[in-house]
Amino acid sequence: MAACHRILLLLSVAVASGAAQKPPLTKRGLLEFGGIITCSTGRSPLSYVMYGCYCGLGGKGWPRDKADCCHEHDCCYGEAETLGCQTKTDQYRWKCEDKKVECDDLNDKCEKFLCKCDRDAAKCLEKAPYNQKYLFWPSFMCGSEEPKCSIY
């Protein structure tokens, strides 16, 4: 579960250093997710580093709203890890066209799976209204009940 949160923290550093500026076709591993968020939503991945109960460091309780998509992303990465994928280091190529992430031509099972995880999470973020009140949401307000990954 904490994988998404570590990813978002690393993304914030990458974005701050200008690493999110990508050529049309990119291969970068862990930092894919930040670029995919920007492609799909037009927002900086920093907007989600401490959003709700799952987007950011840690992760517990019940997601606050539809934009608190990181629990589902954590579950997807967990499934990828059971397939032997290295969610922090495996790389894949993708491109952004008209706010759509394209990575359908990948052949490697881990590349395909990780791209799907990142693309689905970014689509979730794109569709959901961004609620400013959940930025910097305190974890003590998240409760102790958590959804199971099987709900997705």
UniProtKB/Swiss-Prot annotation:
Class of the enzyme per the UniProt entry, highest EC level: hydrolase
Disulfide bonds: C39-C96, C53-C142, C55-C70, C69-C124, C75-C149, C76-C117, C85-C110, C103-C115
SUPFAM superfamilies: Phospholipase A2, PLA2
Tissue distribution: Expressed by the venom gland. Heavily expressed in the venom gland transcriptome.
Superkingdom to which the source organism belongs: Eukaryota
Subcellular location: Secreted
Protein name: Phospholipase A2
Protein species of origin: Meiacanthus atrodorsalis (Forktail blenny)
